[in-house]
Amino acid sequence: MRKRLLCISILFSTFDSLYAGNSWIRINQLGYLPDAVKVAVLISEEDIRIGHFQLRNAITETVVYKGQTKEYDASGWGMKSAYRLDFSNFKNAGGYYIQIDDIKSPCFRIANDVYNGTADFILNYMRQQRCGYNPYLKDSCHLNDGIIVDHPTKTGREIDVTGGWHDASDYLQYLTTSANATYQMLFAYLHNPGAYGDNYNAKGHKGKNGIPDILDEAKWGLEWLDKMNPAYGEMYNQIADDRDHIGYRLPSKDTAGYGLGKHRPVYYITGKQQGLAKHKNRTTGVSSSAAKFASAFALGAQLIKEYYPVFANKIAKKAAEAYEFALSDLGVCQTACNVSPYFYEEENYVDDLELAACELHRLTNKKYYFDQAVKWGAVEPVTPWMSSGRARHYQFYPFVNLGHYYLSEKQSIYIDYLKDGLQFIYERCEKDPFLNGIPFIWCSNNLVVAALTQARCYYNATKDSTYIKMEAALRDWLFGCNPWGTSMICGLPAGGDYPQLPHSSITYLLNETTYGGLIDGPVDKTIYNNLRGIHLLKKDEYAPFQNGKAVYHDDMGDYSSNEPTMDGTASLSFYLSSMEKEGNRNK
């Protein structure tokens, strides 16, 4: 009998070891706030039955908590088993790991300070993306921007629009994403000023200048927007085009040619279809771009006035003028392409008008702007990708409507609008082990951040915890609680599993990651297989996890899932600063 029991024990031990090799426990590598929802996810290539899990002290290895598992459908991620492991009731600070038989998670922390410094950390990427003078490279680039194109009378003239940020790992610059990035950083500072330090000066070099670093970065964006809108009704939407896509090189060594000598083309906002070659966009008006100018100028004027009063007054005036111009030719203004059919396919503009009117109301307290905001806000109650679960590339942009949050303080119907958007996402995620109802389009991580932002705004406005578990799951997704077990932010957390080989010249030529950058994120297999020019450069370390609905590669050759973006990174500012604020509140 004893021998038989020993054999059974060895048999189960063998099974445990076998499962440990193809079963994984995914966690938020950054850690968990003590009072927050805390969940890990187990996925397995085997059909296994698990009822309980243990939380162990990382130093003593003693069991500090036992919890029950909850089974979910694993098939969507190409697995046979999936369980959610909820340990929210355990609130003691410290270092821990989760264990189920021989399956162990990485170690993680529970503490109120796990998000401290993260909102400042992502500004490293914004500084790295600066055009003109680049503090990361300590060098300058694109000092001859640019030559006007598509203007009825000024085509061929020089215009000084040096500055701003490169959009991603290419060196194009778009008003669309730059204005949104500027606004997002200002919005974060408006709501969570205590999360931001002063460790860099206005040029982006280390050293205090008496101004929070996030305002330094937003000011950098505002100065460029000011150049791109030199006079009433004269706005520019883009510098360069996809002729830029000629391979890896540092921005200071940019050799892309546009037939303009040392200059790059600067696209005038015409309100009509644009494209200097075969491929054209589908522009129908000026509203989406002009209103983005207005919202960034209006909020910027309020927040930088203490430090730059003259400039603040200048852009306050431009904000009102930009809104007036936005109403003059209703429609969307898309980015322009040249050698390929890829561009930002923005198709909504009423959200931009709503937000611009909100910020002008905040700036001026004029009833006209409030009435305008309500008018436009009622046209699009829910950002369309949230309700439909699909979108083309940047079809509904910005990905979150922050005008609704402003109006929710005045009219309860806008709280309903915020809730409706979250409910659509929630209904798509209920059966997913990672509670992720985001469509895996190109730049899916930007949608994750948008959903997180809306969830946090809704909770701030209502204290309704209906979506708090989904919010936690999406937050954890960005830090490693996903099928691949990787953080989606380069360099965060330190010592964790994060993108080491993003699609970037910084990585290719300098052998460094793009610290602070949020990568595009997992993309639907069908989209991935139909994109041009993707060639993996190494063996896929995540091969076991590519059999589900979406794929991700930490590979320089995959621009679809592993390229950091400037606007996505900036959009993280509000959420990360909110989490730091939450942790510090509970200390």
Label for each model-derived stretch:
Residues 286, 290, 294-304, 312-362, ...:
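Aromatic-lined, polymer-binding surfaces characteristic
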